[in-house]
């Protein structure tokens, strides 16, 4: 792997490093049951596939899709409860990184590249995932939309690059927002479409990516 083409890797989290569905789906169903029990929302529960479809979206988009017609108060409560239920699921040992992620990050880090996370997720969740799997130390910076109050991935990545003086590198993700953020900020975009795992986007979302990978380990050779 050569530094001639970049100095840093900026990773999305959900669907890129972490198998989000193993935590977010059961956590959401816990949240939905609590909302119904408290009389805060009586709509039908979304299917697992509908829950998966919101991964990577900003909070407004998430709740408009999963709880259409819900009050702002109910959406705020649901957002807080879902976060807590996700953290509880992580504490219970749920969830997994994609194969090769932990070793791959270590290899890239040891070769002198700076690693970052840029996620639309909430900060406690993002940091909770990285901490639960012991990979926080590989990252120079961890950027989440909520913590930075920047609910646009193009701007979130731009802020990250400005604050850490990143002039070139790679954007690695699985959604169209990752492709757009990378392109908008002059990064080489690597789209993740892992073979044998659920995809949270349709095939068109990664159009425009410079490279596509079917496993995380491919990143070690493609970025060279």
Predicted regions and their residues:
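A short, structured active-site edge motif that brings together acidic residues
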Residues: 51, 135-151
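Conserved Lys-Pro-Asp/Glu-containing loop-to-beta segment of HAD-superfamily phosphomonoesterases
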Residues: 152-179
């Amino acid at each position: 792997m050569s530094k001639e083409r970049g100095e840093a890797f900026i990773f999305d989290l959900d669907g890129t490093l972490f198998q989000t569905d193993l935590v977010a789906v059961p956590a959401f169903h816990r949240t939905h049951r609590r909302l119904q029990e408290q009389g805060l929302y009586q709509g039908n529960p979304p299917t697992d596939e509908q829950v998966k479809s919101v991964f990577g979206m900003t909070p407004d988009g998430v709740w408009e899709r999963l709880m259409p017609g819900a009050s702002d108060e109910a959406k705020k409560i649901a957002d807080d409860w879902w976060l807590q239920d996700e953290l509880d699921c992580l504490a219970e040992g749920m969830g997994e990184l994609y194969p090769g992620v932990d070793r791959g990050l270590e290899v890239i880090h040891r070769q002198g590249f700076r690693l970052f996370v840029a996620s639309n997720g909430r900060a406690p969740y993002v940091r909770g995932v990285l901490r639960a799997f012991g990979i926080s130390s590989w990252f120079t910076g961890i950027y989440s939309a909520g913590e930075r109050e920047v609910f646009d991935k193009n701007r979130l990545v731009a802020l990250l690059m400005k604050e850490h003086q990143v002039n070139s590198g790679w954007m690695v993700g699985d959604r169209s927002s990752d492709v757009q953020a990378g392109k908008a900020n002059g990064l080489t975009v690597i789209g993740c479409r892992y073979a044998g795992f659920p995809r949270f986007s349709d095939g068109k979302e990664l159009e425009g990516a410079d490279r596509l990978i079917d496993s995380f380990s491919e990143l070690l050779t493609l970025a060279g």
